[in-house]
Each structure stands twice: as structure tokens, then as C-alpha cells.
Amino acid sequence: MEAFIQKKPLEAHNPKKQLWLFALSVLLILLNILSNNIYPFLAPDAPVNGQIAVVAGWMPDKALAKTAERLAGSDYQLILTSGGELEYGSLFSEYPNYAELAKATLQIDGVDSAAVIAVPAQQTVKAGEIAASAVAVRTWLAENRPEVTRFDLFAPGPQARRARLIFHRTLGDSFEIGVISIPLENVPTRKWGRSGEGLRVVGGELLALLHDAVPF
């Protein structure tokens, strides 16, 4: 009976399989290194210390509160809040756009109301909030402060680099635009890849930046 039982041969050495395992390990290490550097790349903190600050009014309330903290210790003479029509809830809000809503929020957070001016855009977030806001700011500066050639843009977390890119593209090389990234409460700055919201926001902003930076 034993003569008919065949023993399974030991698995032979497979160099191709080991090579694939090594390549996979290297790939995982590279992805981990890359993920640790994606957020800082998307969310730079590089102000030019101009006299004017431009605030992305579509930031969440807690991000606007952090913005107010940064503004409190600054030398900005004027603060422009930007943003288009509210994406939802406008029927129940006394503020028709993010610019005016952000202005009111900053005032509640302690920012001097005399230093804040709302500069509303004409489009919603889905229709191109950043570009429309850049156009509105450019128009306001041309009409009211034509001598201004540099300012700092306060933008939400990983959207900061893309926001500066769009503002620079809209206003042109005659403007020097700094950027200050305001952390978002629900998006970890380091281990963002471990949360669904982090993956959605950071991954989405990375793709959006590539789309806006590379002409098609």
C-alpha cells in the first residue's frame, strides 16, 4: 500500500518569487516614504509677509478659528475673505456667500472687524471656487489697492499649494503670493493614509493639483 503513496516533493527554490517579494517590499517602503512627504508638499507654509492677507472663506469653522489665531499675532493691515455662493444651506443663512460668512466668523473669533473686508466671488465650489475667488480678489485690488503686489493666502490644509498655484496663474507674475496652510480637524497631517477622510481629501487634492498644474 505504501508503495502507491507518493510523497509531495519539497518546494524548489524559486528565485523569481523571491525577486517579486523583494520588489514588493521596496515598493511598500517607497510608498510609505512618499505618503509621509505628500502632505507637507501639498500644505506648504511659506508667507511673504505682505500687508494684506487673503483668507479662503470656504474653510471649516475650526480652521477659520486657527486662522484667527495666526492673524492675531500678525502685522497684516487688511484681511480679505474670499469665496463664492454657499454650496448648501443658503436659504437658512443670513450670509449669501462664503466670503461674508468667513468675515463674520473671524469677527466672532476675535479679529478686528474694521480690518476685514469680504470679497465675494460669483461661483460656487463645484463651479471653480478658487479660480473665481482669485478673479474677485484681483478685481478688488485693482480697484481699491492697486499699489499692492504681494499678499499671503490662508488656505485649508492640503489645498494650499493648489490654491496658490491658481491665484498666481490668475493674478500673474507681477504678484508675489505667499501661502499659509491651516490644518484641518479631520485630516491628520502625518498618518492621513490611515483614515478614509484623509485618503479622500489628500488623495483628491493631489489629483486636483496634477490636473491644474499639467496642461491637457
Predicted segments, located by residue:
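N-terminal Lys/Arg-rich, disordered targeting/topogenic segments
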Residues: 1-16
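Amphipathic, soluble alpha/beta structural segments
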Residues: 10-13, 85, 89, 202, ...
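Hydrophobic membrane-insertion alpha-helices, especially the h-region
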Residues: 18-36
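A transmembrane-helix-recognition feature enriched in membrane-embedded lipid enzymes
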Residues: 194-216
